[in-house]
Amino acid sequence: MRSASPLAPAELRGNRLWMRNYAISLRSWHNRKKLLREGGYTMKQEKAYYHLPGLFEFYELYREFLPLFRTHREYFYDWCDIGSIYGAPADCVWGGGRAGFGEHDPKEVLALTREYGISARLTFSNSLLREEHLSDKKCNALCALFERENPVQSGVIVHSELLLDYLKTHYPQLYFVSSTTKVLTEFQQLRAETAREEFRYVVPDFRLNKAFGELDSLLQAQKDKVEFLCNECCWVGCRDRKRCYENVSRKNLGEACPEHICTAPGAEEGYRFSKAMENPGFIGIRDIQDVYMPMGFSNFKIEGRGLGSALVLEFLLYYMTKPEYQLHVREAIYLDNMLDLF
């Protein structure tokens, strides 16, 4: 059966930004199908690496999940692995993206990632930092600890150029990730960002996820840096995304500011994975295997720091766990014969 070309949702056809990227995607659709059939993508990746949310926030979940991932590898897809776990403790001035709420001892967190050979990332993506914030004792202590005590290199997700320059000077053993909070919606922005030597990874705005023609024009070294945000639930026509992130940055700085009110359709429902799956920018496991890996991409970010651990577990089940073993994982982590929901 022939695959149908992707259709633009009717409610988005007036949004110029999304329609531009949609047009690029549509133009490349048939060429991409032809290349896949003919084996035209010569840099096919053999392994996808997931960058998972909640280093501090979901420590208890990972303390149960990671031993299972190691001892029962047959439960999980052999084409994927864990590239990193990212997050930030509560009350970090440098924090951004989401307000951190993790309370676990950073040494315990690092001990867990060290035991399983996983890179730990600090989410320090505040976009509004000033010179006086660079001396923050808590954030500096975290960077020093992460640079010193993890044999697998640790990283920092960063937005501020001021902070990036500071970290490069004071913590040169850390690697750096360009944050999705920059809201890179223009492909030339992404191309330029991936050309920067200081960034090992770059997370573009999710609205570039399906710009296949342009994405495939990147050099392989640039493709290796691109880290796609897979499960975003934000409305694809949103024009307030950067302001939303700035609101979080102000809160982390302790500034008095009004709550950002999301005006997107269905915003009152909050995050729903089923809704995210309907997002035109959603990247599912078939997309990863059949499109992105054959094109030469291998890094995929799962969002979820501000959600509950039950939903994050569902992400781990969907993206990493074979369907026939998903119940096994639930039973190993929380499900027993006496659990009541109501």
Regions found by a protein language model. Give the residues of each.
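Residue-identity detector for glycine
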Residues: 14, 39-40
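Short linear segments in intrinsically disordered or otherwise low-structure-confidence regions
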Residues: 3-5
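N-terminal secretion targeting segments of exported proteins
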Residues: 7-10
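Active-site pocket-lining/capping segments in soluble small-molecule metabolic enzymes
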Residues: 44-193, 198-342
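Cationic, low-complexity basic patches in intrinsically disordered or flexible, solvent-exposed regions
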Residues: 12, 35
